[in-house]
Amino acid sequence: MDPLGARSCFVDADILPCWADVSNEEGEDVPDGGRKDVPDGGSHSPFPYRKDINEKVILWKGDVALLNCTALVNTSNETLTDKNPVSDSIFRYSGPELLEEMQKLKGCRTGEAKLTKGFNLAARYIIHTVGPKYKTKYRTAAESSLYSCYRNVLQLAKEQGMASVGFCVITTQKRCYPLDDATHIALRTVRRFLEVHGQALEKVVFAVTEEEEGTYRRLLPLYFPRSLEEEQRSILLLPQDIGNSDGEPVVPERQIRISEKPGVQEEDSEEEGLVKDLSVIGSHAFARMEGDVDKQRRLALQGQLSGAAMQKQHQRNYNRWLSRARTEDLSDIAALKALYQSGVDNCGRSVMVVVGRNIPVLLIDMEKALLYFIHMMDHVTAKDYVLVYFHTLTGEHNHLDSDFLKNMYDIIDVKYKKNLKALYFVHPTFRSKVSTWFFTTFTVSGLKDKVHQVESLHQLFTAIPPEQIEIPPFVLDYDARENGPLFTSQSSFLSL
């Protein structure tokens, strides 16, 4: 039982004034009464005055962690370890049990929502979500991800039968999302959800800071007008993009028309296509697509696609990955220090190092990990190189799935395979040796002769001088315990 007064800091959402009772910008009370017909010539707002919806919405300046509601929202990163004022406060008030629970979640992708208990909070549950990082050239992707955050939180609350939800501002300052743009998405997504599923939620609280309050108070009337007059005033202030019926951002040029008869062969409609207006060719977003990818794969499987065509197709695919790797923000993957370039081996070849223990497979976006691998390796693989993989003290959660490795092997450019001269597998286990043998024998047989199982750093140093490779301290400590102090020895690697 909590000591007397321990929860005096918490605020009951039910006693907070709803948006319908808050005075408008002129400082006058908002007129009550039902909706009337819009006068002739008046514009119809896509977000009409709804007193019943306004009574469910609350704007509150305060710490979301202090809300007494069914669930509150925590904004974090993909490993759920972000340090920001919202998360810090939630962890502080919830107690150490939350940290233990978070480790079981195994991360959260951008736009997703995951549920934990509230523990020592007044709220029964915490819904964790990950907002997007904002870059102007990827604005559309960021908008879609942010919409998914709010929509998935609301959907989860509905599925769990929650009565009230307390939202923080999901986009943190470090993710650089403009507050105005983020607020538009937040408000319209909640509005559209309440229009359809209003019976599922009694209260939705927007918990904001003093800096955020002004923006929310200015934009709330656009999506939650408190009178017919406010509705009419707000029409001209609405942005051009108000999303679809769910509030989701829509990019017209990316909408694809689905064929009425997808099973019919392309030849059946060939003549019809000739008479269509040719002026539209090249005007849509997919004009540069070269052929039917699925058809090319099918022909390849049937042996009907030439080697040159397959090579060209593979090169185009790799170039797309490389382009993404050069433009996306991969700082969270780089911070793991799981892949880095070191010196050169005895033959003057570049040395790339992979630290298995630093790869939290279950907590990171593996697609971003692949992009980072391409980003780091593309220039190195232009000439001969060697790869050192430290398997030292890895756990089950560090082991890369064979399907991921096969997919990576299929995606990377031919120079990666051609110019790789040796792969040193340091501190292998019996299980890793068996797995490596199966993988290099049956999945990527071209790699088998290049793999060398290295039991100790003594062996590794016969191929790579100690001063030419950066080794993590825990690897040095492990090797000293298992194999004794470092000393110079001869090995078959001298011939490599």
From Swiss-Prot:
Q: State the family named in the UniProt similarity comment for this chain.
A: Belongs to the GDAP2 family.
According to the entry, every stretch annotated as the CRAL-TRIO domain falls at 329-483
Q: Per its UniProt record, what Gene3D superfamilies does this chain match?
A: CRAL-TRIO lipid binding domain, Leucine Aminopeptidase, subunit E, domain 1
Write down the superkingdom of origin.
Eukaryota
Q: Which residues form the signal peptide?
A: none
Stretches assigned to the Macro domain:
44-224
Q: Which organism is it from?
A: Xenopus laevis (African clawed frog)
InterPro entries, per the entry: CRAL-TRIO_dom, CRAL-TRIO_dom_sf, Macro_dom, Macro_dom-like, Macro_GDAP2
Please give the residue ranges the record annotates as the region Disordered: 25-48
Supply the name of the protein.
Answer: Ganglioside-induced differentiation-associated protein 2
